[in-house]
Amino acid sequence: YPLRRQRQMCIRDRSNRISLDEIIDHAQEDVNNLIFGGVDGIIIENFGDTPFVKDDISKRTLANFTTVVENLSIDKDIKIGINVLRNDGIAALSIAEATKSNFVRINVLNNTMFTDQGVIEGKSHEISQFKSTLNNVIEIYADVFVKHAVPAPGSKIENHAAELIERAGADVVIVTGDGTGHEINLNDLEKVRNIVPEGKLAIG
């Protein structure tokens, strides 16, 4: 996919430990360093909010997340993505709409994954319906066999990838390793590429 490199930065929503202004300052420092390093895109996520809620973040987190993104100074040439952990696609789209971000990352868009937050079922229909009400064009980057999770027995990564594009409305399929920072399985990547030869893929 044309993005040379995408890096993730995290947002913490714990005012008893760090103020919102401090979060913004730290986030801006991350942005500056990433841009200096030559990235084309940045994913902003609430990585510090462990243990994560499964799929419905608090209104406070939604408001703080939006405020942080709105207050970042980022060159217009840099694509901005929103990922609301663990799997709140509606919130991600809402933040992206409000902040004019380019895309969202959704960890489980369709099918079912067994995660450290329990069983997560994709909500591609609800997300598609909500996306259709938005004014801005926002791409959906969707994980296939997302990290820190396992699929149902008998599932095949290539079938899940095809369904993400053909049935769930994903614009880009993300192939990852088993956990944060783990390398991907090249055999899995090859299977995904073969099943969606014209589809857009990202590795992360």
Residues covered by each model-derived region:
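Single conserved hydrophobic/aromatic residue that forms the stacking wall/gate
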Residues: 1-11
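Conserved anion-binding
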Residues: 91-172
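Glycine-rich, proline-tolerant flexible connector loops at the mouths of alpha/beta enzymes
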Residues: 40-64, 111-116, 170-183
